[in-house]
């Protein structure tokens, strides 16, 4: 176990951060991830990923997902073949982070 759990396609965002983060990939695709909402005891926050033609992994048009990562939020955005379509996948990669407790 162990190793780097943050790759070029993953961004680890502290749950207490409420500023707007502009994520720019090496391919030139841009996406704006915004962390909003008060942090609950479970570290529950809402991250809004606003991109051009933003689609979730189910194929539906969506611009907001709820991710709870025990104090951290993980937003995974991967650019598709076209520029106007960017797939934003929201998955709580529990296996990628060390367990607390």
From Swiss-Prot:
What highest taxon heads this organism's lineage?
Answer: Viruses
* Record Pfam families: DUF681
Under InterPro entries, the record lists: BFDV_Orf5
- Record's protein name: Uncharacterized protein ORF5
What organism is recorded for this protein? Beak and feather disease virus (BFDV)
Lineage runs: Viruses, Monodnaviria, Shotokuvirae, Cressdnaviricota, Arfiviricetes
